[in-house]
Amino acid sequence: MSDSELSRDAERFLIHLTVERGLAANTLAAYRRDLHRYVAFLTSRGIARPAQVDEITVRSFIASVSASTHGPDDAPYKTTSVSRVLSAIRSFHHFLVGEGIVAHDATSEVVRPRVPRPLPHPLGVDEVRRLIEAPDLGTPSGLRDRAILEVLYGVGVRISELTGLDVDDLDLDGGFVRVVGKGG
């Protein structure tokens, strides 16, 4: 990093992360990379002091990260990586405000990129069978656990629906369970 006020504050922040927050080495290395890149971006735009950074500049930086590539195959950055970079920059700006270096957090209105939630991977038939057969039926808790697993798999209820079931919801003669689903 250059010897600007901004780069000195970034180094102070990294020391703070090491001493005060005790971050793991890999996390600290990621923060260091992200901050170096951020300071270089700001310096290239003539910004040398934290007080010169505004929300538009932060958004421009995040857009530049989103548009860039990395690695030997020039892969684009994933949304999760862009989100992690923003998290590091946000922590830096919170530090700057906390230390009284700036009065306003330039990241406060910057929206985190939406990270897609991965779809769950369904269990195979053999995995479900082994799971249902796992409880020890010789114990009351084993019988309970087996019943829970049978209802979860056989009926397809949500956990919240299952935990809301009462004995009155069971009709053993008719062979059904009354479940009040989401939304009543």
What are these regions (language model features)?
Residues 1-184:
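Conserved catalytic core of the tyrosine transesterase superfamily
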